[in-house]
């Protein structure tokens, strides 16, 4: 009896600073976090400040598509 769409979905947060620097090939990698969000409470894309081990600072991590 599973519903068609679950309320909680798994999302991936990616560092926006590393993505911009990846074009110039300055960054050794791209930081990604896996988390969950409630689709009813947060219908828009999620953005959180998380620590990026490649930038060595707290940056904005935005939700990406799978």
Swiss-Prot record:
Similarity section: Belongs to the bacterial ribosomal protein bL33 family.
InterPro entries: Ribosomal_bL33 (IPR001705), Ribosomal_bL33_CS (IPR018264), Ribosomal_bL33_sf (IPR038584), Ribosomal_zn-bd (IPR011332)
Pfam families for the chain: Ribosomal_L33
HAMAP family (UniProt xref): Ribosomal_bL33
Gene3D superfamilies: Ribosomal protein L33
Name of this protein: Large ribosomal subunit protein bL33c
Locations listed in the record: Plastid, Chloroplast
Broad class of the protein's primary localization: plastid
UniProt keyword terms in alphabetical order: Chloroplast, Plastid, Ribonucleoprotein, Ribosomal protein
Organism: Aethionema grandiflorum
